[in-house]
């Protein structure tokens, strides 16, 4: 998980995360914070283990901690957050030592995390479900 630790310590990641928290401080619905990222990571990891898939833990956690970081650009520039997040993720993942093949898996998953059309056992499909399961929408006070 050494490479994953490099992500959360990466200067661009920290700056983008702080900007995102500021932009969402008055958000009515639940935000995109460390609690959400950690929930998505944990749920994804459990689902991967249950299906006996060979996806390393740091790939899962890295994807979870990067998947909504494009929200800052969405709010400021009107760019879809999955596309903005994929661009940001590519830069950060490269700096943190992930291979081109690993980056492709993670970036593709980030691009598909809102609308997946993958086979059920793919990482993108698992990640999509984990992202949805991470939210307690049924008890949402904003509804």
Place the predicted regions along the sequence by residue.
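Metal-dependent phosphohydrolase cores
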Residues: 1-143
């Amino acid at each position: 998980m050494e490479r994953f630790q490099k992500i959360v310590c990466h200067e661009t990641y920290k700056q983008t995360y702080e900007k995102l928290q500021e932009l969402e401080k008055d958000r009515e619905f639940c935000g995109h914070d460390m609690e959400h990222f950690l929930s998505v990571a944990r749920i994804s990891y459990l689902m991967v283990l249950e299906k006996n898939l060979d996806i390393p833990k740091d790939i899962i956690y890295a994807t979870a901690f990067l998947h909504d970081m494009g929200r800052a650009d969405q709010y400021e520039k009107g760019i879809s957050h999955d596309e903005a997040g994929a661009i940001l993720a590519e830069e950060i993942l490269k700096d943190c030592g992930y291979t081109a093949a690993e980056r492709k898996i993670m970036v593709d998953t980030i691009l598909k995390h809102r609308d997946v059309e993958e086979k059920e056992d793919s990482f993108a499909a698992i990640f999509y479900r984990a992202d949805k399961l991470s939210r307690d929408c049924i008890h949402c006070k904003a509804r």
